[in-house]
Amino acid sequence: EQQGLPAPKILISERAQVLMPYHVALDCYEEERLGKNSFGSTKSGIAPFYGDKFQKIGLQLCQLYYPDVLREKLAHALDIKNAMIVNLYHREPVDLEALIVKLTELAERIRPYVADTDAYMMQAVREGKKILLEGQLGTLRDPDHGIYPMVTSSSPLAGYGPVGAGVPVWSIKEVIAVTKAYSSCVGAGPFTTELFGDEAEELRKRGGDRGEYGATTGRPRRVGWFDCVATRYGCEMQGATEVAMTNLDVLGYLDEIPVCVAYELNGERVDHFPVTPKLEQCKPIYVKLPGWKCDTRGIKNFDELPENARHYIEFLEKEVGCPFKLISNGPRRDEIIYR
């Protein structure tokens, strides 16, 4: 506002759970305690946050505006949290009064944006407005259907989108799954097609917008070849109606491109995505496709892509079993090929 910019047109649900400073601290302390057995957390407080939510000791945003409720809820939570912080992690306890002051100040700053978003969204549904829900992470980080326990704490499946947004399930008509032209991951867990050494570093350096590095942590992402087994499973669990594939342009340096079409488990071919203990024993079965050895950036029509690039997309599409409708051919928003 001081710079003359308009206020953001956003609404924050009054029912939203509040991420506390001690959630972040506990996340960091636990990763440090686990050492080499850590889960590869982003140390953003996600697991402690959801733990409090489901133990019903978390705070909803609306409760920050009722001083007595805030104090009572926070005092109860800190009885538990400080016991952990002091006795398990051997750190200084959180000060109740200082935290109340901080939360009260923050609550006033965002007060203009706090609203009954459930009512707002339902009105949008009744008026037939277009609604776009966006999720992060993917199927393999889902706590039920992913590579448990190396997962996140809330479901990244499209089916949970309406739950989080407060709209009827039937109001969602299309589900667009997003995948890269290769595989990448931040965090621990089995990664069947993972690359190492110089081969991995070359792909990592060329990938993403400015290389494959975590948006939150900045740490190097693990990278590998496209995994049709995992992607097919992901699309099935998401109920995807179409796929948007990014980073096609990244692969233009390769003479040939391995694609994982199945796994080998104890000497047998596996075409479905297995549970984590079995996945850890799987080896990739590759088909090698010819590369196109040129820069495809600037191409806007699918038919103008090199023949081998088109064949690569069509091969993945057939293996995954879902139409690839959008192809990202560069980091800019306008570098998308629509099919």
Model-predicted regions and their roles:
Residues E1-R339:
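Non-transmembrane, aqueous-exposed alpha-helical and coiled segments at domain scale
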